[in-house]
Amino acid sequence: MTSGNHIWDKKEVYEYINDSDCLVRPLNYPNCNWGSGYKIFEVQGVKIAVTNLLGRTFMAPVDSPFEALKNLAEEIKDKVDLIFVDFHAEATAEKVSFGYWAKDLGVHAVFGTHTHVQTADEKILDDKTAYITDAGFCGAFHSIIGMDVEASLKRWTTCIHDRLDVVDSPVAQFNGVKFKFNKITKCCEQVQRISFVKNFSEVI
């Protein structure tokens, strides 16, 4: 599981992440932070490195995600078969630029996150690297990026920033992306967006 700029919002994660074998914090946070900025998983004999980096445009100051990924790719490229990157960023131009940078470093897939809105620009860069600007989110369908509609509207119409709560609703949307790779060349052959809505109140 990758994370993002809210990774430290709950204090419970401080100790948990050190013992977790599946939770990744942003790689370009300071090294003194808890946890690790990448993990290596083996799936059906294929070693996959998964890392998470934060963008810097309209975000809190962090180390360069470009340099952080370059250093990581050089360190692990001979140890794994595939490298997947979750780039948690706000600006589209920064995300697209990062995709091309990652492609030149030998990364196999880059999927953006953070905006909670799935984009329709899935592509394969130079017949090698899978890319999508934002994979979207999983959460309440009748919401404003997962948050309560009335509270969100109050923020926009009154400039009063009350607490925003996650909507508890039986109608949920599911976003994601699926990649298909060539077993021999390791190049991506297909990028497929996943998006559907399910009403759990109708489930018996």
Set out the residue ranges of the language-model regions.
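Acidic, metal/ion-coordinating pockets
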Residues: 2-204
